Amino acid sequence: MSNYETSQTSDLKELINKLRDTQTLSKNEWIRLIDGRTPELADYLFENAREVQITHYGHDVYVRGLIEFTNYCRNDCYYCGIRKSNLNAHRYRLTKEEILNCCKTGYELGFRTFVLQGGEDGWFTVPRLADIVSDIHKNWPDCAITLSVGEMEHDAYQTLFDAGADRYLLRHETYNDAHYRKLHPVSLSARHRQNCLWDLKSIGYQIGTGFMVGAPFQTTENLTDDMLFLKELNPHMVGIGPFIPHHDTQFASEPAGTLELTLYLLGLILSLIHI
């Protein structure tokens, strides 16, 4: 390794230390840390992230009961296999009784968090969803209820919260508006999705967000914007994952996101946000 490379690695390690200690980096520092990653730097990051994880979260693993209750969706996101224009998707939706039976089985198995996740299915109106949430809350009051059902207006989120929902998962996908428009139809906007997250947080939900890694057209600057948004929002949960091309979308031939970059970003996020 040359003296220049040694110096650069040392500088980037100092940025990792700064992130760990202050949870703050400038945009330029984020870009340097992402673009300058090496196996050696990743090992140093993971060592630091592991210390943060043990200090703040210990070694506990929490198991969630995920109920995928519908794959109908009104949206047409270009990367998604359940987009409304995919006529090859086998559609289904669970009944209220089937959802409650899933909760009953899960409770008997020891689950104490239920996650209701689905596409933005117009059949499940806010009153219908609120009725289901209310029954889950009444039958299993010691369980947390998490929703992941997409974008709504403030009043709808409030109704579901009042019915007993505790948490809400809504990945922002990408913060940058221009990048967002390349992945979604004009009926959807990055700003509206971000506003949904602010609404959810103001109501009192524990919120989770996140983004795709290696999505088509994604740049380091886009990832940096995502990191700065996470810092500003300070969510309770963050979930990221590599972009996986779906065969029934226009991105079918695009390369998948990498595990290497996903794990590296997870290490950075763990150092950035620890509740």
Language-model segment annotations:
Residues 1-75:
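Flexible, acidic/Gly-rich N-terminal and inter-domain linker regions that tether
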Residues 22, 49, 77, 116, ...:
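Conserved, mostly hydrophobic/aromatic
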Residues 44-86, 91-115, 166:
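N-terminal pre-triad scaffold of radical SAM enzymes
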Residues 64-67, 115-126, 178, 244-253:
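Glycine-rich, proline-tolerant flexible connector loops at the mouths of alpha/beta enzymes
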Residues 84-99, 106-127, 132-197, 206-213, ...:
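Core AdoMet radical
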Residues 154-160, 216-230:
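Catalytic cores of alpha/beta
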Residues 226-269:
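A beta-strand-loop signature enriched in Asp, Gly, Thr, and Trp
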Residues 273-275:
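Conserved small/polar residues in nucleotide/adenosyl-binding loops
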